[in-house]
């Protein structure tokens, strides 16, 4: 079974930001080490959307160029119908159990990302989500703080 790391918007935003603080530099080094060690790292479409919309809003052309470069270098996981059907199921279960991860009217990126991981897990893949938001994602998927993914 192959292992794949899905980048959530938090780490993806840090590695695509050309203006770095110490945490972002640490995240860039972490990502490079994953790639050098042969781990498959994938950018989920929903994480790309979350980071891209903010870069576009802020007119961050260098950040967009870096995001596009990462997208070309790493794997990319498009949102599929199967993932959206699973996301709807996750959304309903989370709300019915009193543990929503977003406002009822919001597009819940966390459940979409967790659903993408669940769909990947149905095959020969063992996905782990590298995130800054383990609390919400960890309810629905194998989600770990990005520093803990190796």
What is each model feature region?
Residues 43, 78, 108, 131-132:
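Short beta-strand scaffold positions
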Residues 51, 105-127:
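Acidic, metal-associated active-site segment
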């Amino acid at each position: 079974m192959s292992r794949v790391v899905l980048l959530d918007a938090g780490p993806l935003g840090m590695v695509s930001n050309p203006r770095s603080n110490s945490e972002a530099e640490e995240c860039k080094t972490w990502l490079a080490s994953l790639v050098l060690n042969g781990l498959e790292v994938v950018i989920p479409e929903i994480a790309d959307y979350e980071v891209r919309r903010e870069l576009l809003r802020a007119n961050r052309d260098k950040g967009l160029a870096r995001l596009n470069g990462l997208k070309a270098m790493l794997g990319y996981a498009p949102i599929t119908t199967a993932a959206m059907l699973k996301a709807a199921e996750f959304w309903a279960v989370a709300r019915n159990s009193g543990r929503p991860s977003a406002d009822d009217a919001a597009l819940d990126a966390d459940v979409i990302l967790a659903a993408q991981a669940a769909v990947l897990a149905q095959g020969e893949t063992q996905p782990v989500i590298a995130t800054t938001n383990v609390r919400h994602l960890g309810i629905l998927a194998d989600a770990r703080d990005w520093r803990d993914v190796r």
